[in-house]
Amino acid sequence: MLDTVPPERLLARADLCARWAGLALGVVVAQRLAVRDSDDVAMTFLSAVTAFGLCAVGGVLLGDSLTPAPVEAVRTASLAPRRVRDHVPPRMAPLLLFQTACLVVLLMIGAATASPDSMSRASRAVTVTCRGATRPLGPWPGIHYATPILASVALGTAACVWALRRIAHRPGGNQQRHDRSWAITAAWGLLVSSQLLLVLAMIGRVLSRTTCAGMLGNVTALVIYPLGLLTLFSLGWCLFTIVMPRAVGDE
């Protein structure tokens, strides 16, 4: 007698393949964007990072759409309402929200302090005065770079929130909702963490190119470098959560 694969297993494999496909497509698109000719290297890398994050989100959302909720034979009403926060990672979700807040704050500060670069292109550098000489240093996360970052984060956040609400209120077991919610949270976190890491790299590069940052520069360094390590940890967790197999068919 031939062994048959349960439909739940096939759907779980389709979900995992969609996630891997999203990451693979993101790598291909990011590579093509990274090697294109441009006089703005920072925007080139920003476009590549943004494309990778959005493709990862798209792959996870596609995988979720390929796994329809099971049709329950008996529906029973629950007195406790289903909430999104009951299914997302209890520790990583607050951390990712904190990183999102840090990203927004850094972009606001960057936009407020940005100035034209050496080629008179607006909002791409920060003016530094050192030993009586004033010069622009960049790239700096001014409005020129903040606009695509905020647009991509807003788009990814809206899509992931919609998916999380849909998962929380549709039929199915708690384990399935848990698995889907974790994967979508990780995809959103990958988008946010990668953008934050790029912004921190911009600020760190500017600080490394001047010796006149003073106390403010030292305080900034004490903030962004630990935040960078924390962001790297979040990025690794998000990647691992996206690619690891789900337990959809194990209930």
Go through each PLM region and give its residues:
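C-terminal transmembrane-bundle signature of multipass membrane proteins
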Residues: T157-I167, Q176-E251
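Hydrophobic core of alpha-helical transmembrane segments in multi-pass integral membrane proteins
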Residues: V27-A30, A51-V60, C102-L107, L150-V161, ...
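Membrane interfacial helix motifs at helix-loop boundaries and amphipathic/re-entrant anchors
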Residues: V29-V49, M108-I149, A201-P226
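Alpha-helical transmembrane segments of integral membrane proteins
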Residues: R13-W20, T44-A48, P94-L97, A146-I149, ...
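N-terminal membrane-targeting/anchoring modules of bacterial envelope and secretion proteins
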Residues: M1-M119
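Hydrophobic alpha-helical membrane-embedded or membrane-associated segments
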Residues: L16-A24, A48-A56, V153, A186-L190, ...
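Generic multipass alpha-helical transmembrane bundles of integral membrane proteins
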Residues: G63-W182, L191-Q195
